[in-house]
Amino acid sequence: MDRTNIENFLSRLKDLRALVIGDLMLDEYLWGRTERISPEAPVQVVDVVREDLRLGGAGNVINNLVTLGCQVHVASVLGEGHDGLLLRRRLEEKQVGIEGLQFDAKRTTSRKTRILASGQQMMRFDRESRCPIDATQEAVLAEFVSNSADRFDVILVSDYLKGVLTEDLLQSVIAVGKQKGIPVVIDPKGNDYAKYRGATLLTPNRKETEVASGISIVDEESLRLAARTLMQRIDLETLMVTRSEEGISIFFRNGEEVHLPTQAREVYDVTGAGDTVLSLVGLGLAGGLPVSEAAALANIGAGIVVGKVGTSTVNVEELHEAMAHHALEYDSKIRLRESLRDVLEVERRRGKTVVFTNGCFDLLHVGHVKYLQKARRLGDLLVLGLNSDASIRRLKGPSRPLISEQERAHILAALSCIDYVVVFDEDTPLELIDTLRPDILVKGGDYTPETVVGKDLVESYGGRVELIDLVDGRSTTNIIERILDRYEQG
């Protein structure tokens, strides 16, 4: 993550304009104490001491956007009863544009009532409609989006399967976004993702990705297969899978991907975390951030929100504070090859010498560290090309790697001698070397110059190859064998 770029983006939030389309709800919280059992039945009695009523569903996306200071408009259908009018009033109080709202006498505005005691949610009651909106309401919403799209920098779609987001409406919204060059970012729901076909970006969680793709996710490889299958099936530019304690994984149409570790320190309530992710990713794209940086910021925001109880939001000050306290320099070192190519071109123009090496680095040991330190001393910047999990399996067999590519990348990025880490999926780093064009290509002393992949390419544009002696007796294979021997000995 480029921290300066993010800071500049946060300073411009007030100028961004977002349209939120989706299922609006009221989130009601009843806070109390449980100190006795009911005489009527063997159940706890909750003595309510505090009540809270908030915008929920797509309304929590609005909460996030308003808290962040940007300009917000909404398009949806509500019931005409008390809750619908109350929700409208809450939107007006937040200065949200409501010209896209419709009201239906036959519809029940969604209200979710949660009972909390001793810091835990005990029960939830739902009152809502789930039937699709009618054709007239659908046409009115589509016309509103089409006529007003030029006023917005991003369209955020929050689907809770309550009937507002029909397939025809979604396809109309996505088509308008493409025509106008406006990103359409969707937080999806359900198992039929055909209605999201052609969207700019989807933000399903891990379970939703499993259901939509039909592929059980048990490791990084199955996650990749599920993501790629889903993207191809519904013609997606980008898929961003939120993975709770495992962070966020982003998959791009060009085959590249990036993985971000979780930023949560303590988790009290995951309610609304997906809304925070949708809000920050959407605003990031609207503000010109690369997807990976928008996702990294959203990851930080979600980490803040899950540390709060109830449907919560994050503000700019909290984001600044989190960026100051988290070790974001590690994340900023892990790059996609195309973005890293651009960075290295700038550094070379500044007179910097780029050193490149590559490997699996499964079970990092002292031999690795000394090798990397020596490589770094050969130039100004050390770039490490890291074999992906799939690449290692092809090279070393199905039992490897022991450490996932995401974890290996972050361990290596924590080393001060490494400036950038880039994961590659090919069997050799030749294509990556051709993209990055390093000045110095480094391999271990167990190679000869003639056996180094990329030697001819690097020398063809004036670069050179360097071989570094390895530490005797230090290898991942030796460590594994030693562990197994000692385990067998008891």
UniProtKB/Swiss-Prot annotation:
Keywords for the protein's UniProt record, in alphabetical order: ATP-binding, Carbohydrate metabolism, Kinase, Multifunctional enzyme, Nucleotide-binding, Nucleotidyltransferase, Transferase
Reactions listed under catalytic activity: D-glycero-beta-D-manno-heptose 7-phosphate + ATP = D-glycero-beta-D-manno-heptose 1,7-bisphosphate + ADP + H(+); D-glycero-beta-D-manno-heptose 1-phosphate + ATP + H(+) = ADP-D-glycero-beta-D-manno-heptose + diphosphate
Active-site feature positions: 275
Known pathway: Nucleotide-sugar biosynthesis; ADP-L-glycero-beta-D-manno-heptose biosynthesis; ADP-L-glycero-beta-D-manno-heptose from D-glycero-beta-D-manno-heptose 7-phosphate: step 1/4; Nucleotide-sugar biosynthesis; ADP-L-glycero-beta-D-manno-heptose biosynthesis; ADP-L-glycero-beta-D-manno-heptose from D-glycero-beta-D-manno-heptose 7-phosphate: step 3/4
Gene3D superfamilies: 3.40.1190.20, HUPs
Swiss-Prot/TrEMBL GO biological process terms: ADP-L-glycero-beta-D-manno-heptose biosynthetic process
Enzyme class: transferase
GO cellular component, one term: cytosol
Region feature Cytidylyltransferase, mapped onto this chain: 356-490
Binding site for ATP: 205-208
Domain of life of the native organism: Bacteria
Any GO MF annotation of the entry: heptose-1-phosphate adenylyltransferase activity
The keyword Transferase belongs to this UniProt entry's keyword annotation: yes
E.C. numbers: 2.7.1.167, 2.7.7.70
Segments of this protein annotated with the region Ribokinase: 1-330
Function: Catalyzes the ADP transfer from ATP to D-glycero-beta-D-manno-heptose 1-phosphate, yielding ADP-D-glycero-beta-D-manno-heptose.
Entry similarity comment: In the N-terminal section; belongs to the carbohydrate kinase PfkB family.
Record text on subunit structure and interactions: Homodimer.
Name of the protein: Bifunctional protein HldE
Native source species: Syntrophotalea carbinolica (strain DSM 2380 / NBRC 103641 / GraBd1)
